[in-house]
């Protein structure tokens, strides 16, 4: 089954307007990224539950969490990033999202990403291990 899904935050920063647009366009799924200007990964559990209620009322499902995971320099501290990833998994579970979009890091002024293949793979494997057993699929977007 094909699911047509959209980044509704490209239509409006206001979440209610995003849902209205999706319904008017006949799109029943969204890749959720920003809610009222705030990244979905930064929302509290209470805020996520408010989002879920609005989604349910609008009959819109979440196909994926469009996260910023991996969209950081490879030399940034990994533990903070892993904590954000764990939060993203929780958010995906709360919203019944089957996928989390991730990236595969980039270099910095001091670090050429081409020389960091082993570290990139180590980090992606850590994400993969963390999501095991959750039913969530990680989907990679090239930067």
Indicate where each model-derived feature is located.
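Glycine-rich, proline-tolerant flexible connector loops at the mouths of alpha/beta enzymes
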Residues: 31-56, 104-111
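A generic secondary-structure micro-motif detector
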Residues: 8, 40-41, 78, 117
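Active-site acidic/histidine proton-transfer and metal-coordination neighborhood
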Residues: 17-20, 54-57, 73-143
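Structural preference for beta-strand elements that scaffold enzyme active sites
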Residues: 3-5, 29-31, 59-66, 97-101, ...
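Catalytic domains of carbohydrate-active enzymes, especially glycoside hydrolases
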Residues: 15-35, 95-96
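Active-site beta-loop-alpha junctions enriched in small/polar residues
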Residues: 7-11, 33-35, 65-70, 105-107, ...
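Short active-site-adjacent helix-start/loop capping segments
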Residues: 38-41, 71-75
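Boundary/entry segment of secreted carbohydrate-active catalytic domains
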Residues: 1-15
């Amino acid at each position: 089954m094909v699911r047509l899904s959209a980044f509704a935050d490209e239509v409006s920063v206001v979440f209610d307007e995003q849902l209205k647009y999706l319904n008017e366009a006949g799109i029943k799924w969204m890749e959720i990224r920003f809610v009222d200007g705030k990244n979905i990964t930064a929302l509290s559990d209470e805020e996520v539950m408010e989002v879920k209620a609005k989604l349910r009322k609008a009959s819109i499902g979440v196909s994926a969490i469009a996260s910023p995971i991996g969209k950081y320099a490879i030399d940034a501290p990994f533990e903070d990033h892993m904590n954000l990833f764990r939060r993203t998994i929780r958010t995906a579970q709360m919203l019944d999202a089957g996928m989390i979009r991730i990236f595969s890091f980039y270099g910095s002024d001091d670090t050429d990403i081409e020389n960091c293949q082993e570290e990139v793979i180590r980090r992606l494997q850590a994400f993969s291990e963390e999501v095991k057993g959750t039913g969530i699929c990680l989907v990679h977007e090239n930067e």
